[in-house]
Amino acid sequence: MDLSNLKPAEGSVRKNSKRIGRGEGSGKGGTATRGHKGAKSRSGYSKKIGFEGGQMPLQRRVPKFGFTNRNRKVYQGINLDTLQNLVDEGRIKDTVDMDVLVENGLAGRNELVKILGRGELKAKLKISVHKFTASAKEAIEAAGGEVVTL
């Protein structure tokens, strides 16, 4: 092996591709691989998104339906098992109101809250929030707690 017969490893060197549109001498001048005439050969050409060659596009063939209710109220759901975990950790004492929920990161200051019935509640709590499911209300009262709707 000499310096005269060294060559790079197989596949380690890539031949640079020809740059298009750089004069006839480059081998890719003239039409620069775009063919002759027509919209696709012009600068600035791009197909419109959803264009189907003049056929009525899908988004116009499919009918409109439904609407968005602007007056919809969105409630932040909190389950009973979440409240029970906080009681077990000592982060909730005997009353649960918006201040306590915000403090513990369960709801935002301006959010509406709904207590949901998943899990089991053993603690006797006075809970005052915006809404309760029937099963949650039952479980809270069965544990000796109190339900207050804001």
From Swiss-Prot:
Similarity field: Belongs to the universal ribosomal protein uL15 family.
One GO process term, biological-process aspect: translation
GO MF term (any one): rRNA binding
Pfam families, per the entry: Ribosomal_L27A
Keyword terms of this UniProt record: Ribonucleoprotein, Ribosomal protein, RNA-binding, rRNA-binding
InterPro entries cross-referenced by the UniProt entry: Ribosomal_uL15 (IPR030878), Ribosomal_uL15/eL18 (IPR021131), Ribosomal_uL15/eL18_sf (IPR036227), Ribosomal_uL15_bac-type (IPR005749), Ribosomal_uL15_CS (IPR001196)
UniProt name for this protein: Large ribosomal subunit protein uL15
Residues covered by region (Disordered): 1-52
Complexes and interactors: Part of the 50S ribosomal subunit.
A single GO cellular-component term on record: cytosolic large ribosomal subunit
Keyword Ribonucleoprotein among UniProt keywords: yes
Record's function text: Binds to the 23S rRNA.
Gene3D superfamilies referenced in this protein's UniProt entry, alphabetically: 3.100.10.10
Compositional bias of kind Gly residues: 23-32
